[in-house]
């Protein structure tokens, strides 16, 4: 089972192109700092503005750099089922351990359409699938009934849940059991998520605080919620600051402060505002990540 702190990796850019050297450096640093797993080419990785070739290259580079030291869950979702299958097939080819597959966005499929989409991916490629339920971005929500049907498919092993509805964790656990891998998609609510039966988080904050995020997850999984709460209190200002402006603008600014990459995004995303920068800077200092 996938569990612990999985980092939703940013994609570094330099002069408009993917900065492969910075990406490799980031992956190596994450592993050194104790991150439990890597998730390239998701929302935080600016996948909507990566070309297909860039997307595939980033996934391949992540797998090659990790060298099996930690699992790689490759972003492979699309609102075009054929495209999702293509990206999933490539992820398997280069050795990813699983894929993160988002619900159809913009075209707003019905529950039957959501099921048919993921079944097509499941049937086409033999690789573990983590469903990505983020209705705030996709407009559609995978209902409990549909989630239960999807878990009956051979390759569907769990969900990245970014609904911020903590009761859903318990409901899904009741329907599908503890073997259904539930990963939080919200840093701020990850404490409660794991208390309800979750086993980890695909984290934005882990880009700049990997050791703390890993220690936090280890504490919750060990049942040491006193220690987890101490870390949560330390990180909470940063969790909030990283979403003052649209993600990943604030976290790229934070990564730049640590010398990890340039503070560069692709349009239509723009760098964090001056006000957001001040909040991020203060939160980084509060967490002990900067002097």
Curated annotation (Swiss-Prot):
Q: Write one Pfam family the protein is assigned to.
A: DHDPS
One GO cellular component from the entry?
Answer: cytosol
- Protein name listed in UniProt: 4-hydroxy-tetrahydrodipicolinate synthase
Amino acids binding pyruvate: 44, 202
Where, per UniProt, does this protein localize?
Cytoplasm
SUBUNIT field: Homotetramer; dimer of dimers.
Where does this protein come from, organism-wise?
A: Parvibaculum lavamentivorans (strain DS-1 / DSM 13023 / NCIMB 13966)
Give any single GO term for biological process: diaminopimelate biosynthetic process
Report the PROSITE patterns cross-referenced here.
Answer: DHDPS_1, DHDPS_2
Q: Name one GO molecular function term.
A: 4-hydroxy-tetrahydrodipicolinate synthase activity
> In its keyword annotation, does this UniProt entry include Amino-acid biosynthesis?
yes
Q: Which Gene3D superfamilies match?
A: Aldolase class I (3.20.20.70)
